């Protein structure tokens, strides 16, 4: 409902959008101040040039389709919807990060999650990122998106700064 008294705030929108990427990253509130400038500066994507998919666990949601089928289906459905609605999207940027609350929650809720070789709680970029790249390639390659993987790591002992490393994942 609009305010008829003239106090309605009005915000700018893009009349047409032709995004070139979908960027999947974590909703952890501690890290939002790092994600936004990383996407703009290092990925070269301004608002309207990408579709943000912000979910707990970020790209990690793609890592375990057998153990977390509902979460995987949610992400797969989003990629398919985006592909249909925005054929201009050519890139899928998948971001994971150190000290993920989502991973800790899974370790507490799913027995064996931390001890199972396929789904250990991981802290090195290549580990889960290779798995995510392989799953993306196996289940979503038909969309024709170029996958780019990044891992956020804390850059100081206070955990107040984050750096993002490009991960060259190995898929089998």
Describe these PLM feature segments:
Residues 91-99:
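Histidine-centered catalytic micro-motifs
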């Amino acid at each position: 409902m609009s305010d008829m008294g003239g106090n309605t705030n009005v915000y700018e929108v893009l009349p047409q959008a032709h995004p070139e990427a979908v960027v999947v990253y974590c909703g952890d509130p501690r890290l939002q101040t790092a994600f936004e400038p990383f996407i703009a500066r290092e990925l070269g994507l301004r608002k309207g040039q990408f579709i943000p998919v912000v979910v707990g666990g970020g790209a990690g949601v793609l890592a375990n389709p057998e153990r977390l089928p509902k979460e995987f289906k949610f992400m797969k459905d989003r990629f398919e919807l985006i592909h249909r609605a925005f054929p201009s999207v050519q890139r899928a940027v998948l971001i994971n990060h150190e000290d993920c609350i989502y991973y800790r929650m899974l370790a507490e809720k799913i027995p064996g999650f931390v001890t199972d070789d396929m789904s250990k709680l991981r802290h090195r970029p290549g580990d889960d990122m290779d798995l995510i790249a392989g799953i993306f390639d196996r289940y979503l390659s038909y969309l024709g998106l170029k996958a780019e993987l990044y891992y956020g790591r804390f850059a100081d002992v206070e955990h107040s700064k984050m750096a993002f490393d490009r991960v060259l994942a190995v898929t089998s």
